[in-house]
């Protein structure tokens, strides 16, 4: 049965596309105080399946994934789900950052990043602010 409680209904959905389990766990821990419904997939093919079921409000995506590059997946998201915000995260060079932004990423977050940098990035692209 679908949970229709007010707190669940108001939560924004974040999809993390990241193949490294430790990084995903770290992101979950960093965002523990945020009022987000967080889902995680490890590949682009799993992300496509996820999008067929529901569109998240925000995607936090690594670039190097087992079945392709996140940079190439941005255009799929932006074309089919224009309301979904995309934050690319990677330890790549400045040229890759430029390509990610040119492909439609709303923001590029360079690894490693702090909790405040991650939360600021989410708030900047979505306008979400945690209720006190």
Give names to the regions the model predicted.
Residues 40-58:
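Acidic, metal-coordinating helix/loop segments flanking the phosphotransfer/catalytic sites
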Residues 49, 71-81:
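Short amphipathic alpha-helix used as the core "switch/output" element in two-component signaling
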Residues 72, 92-109:
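Alpha4 helix (beta4-alpha4-beta5 surface) of REC/receiver domains from two-component response regulators
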Residues 62:
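Active-site residues of response regulator receiver
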């Amino acid at each position: 049965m679908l949970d229709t409680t007010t707190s669940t209904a108001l939560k924004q959905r974040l999809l993390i596309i990241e193949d490294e389990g430790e990084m995903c766990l770290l992101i979950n821990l960093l965002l523990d105080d945020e009022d987000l419904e967080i889902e995680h997939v490890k590949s682009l093919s799993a992300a496509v399946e996820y999008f067929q079921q529901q569109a998240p409000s925000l995607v936090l995506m690594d670039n190097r994934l087992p079945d392709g590059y996140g940079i190439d997946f941005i255009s799929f998201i932006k074309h089919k789900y224009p309301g979904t915000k995309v934050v690319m995260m990677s330890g790549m060079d400045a040229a890759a950052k430029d390509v990610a932004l040119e492909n439609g990423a709303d923001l590029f977050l360079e690894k490693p990043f702090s909790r405040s940098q991650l939360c600021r990035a989410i708030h900047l692209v979505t306008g979400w602010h945690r209720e006190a």
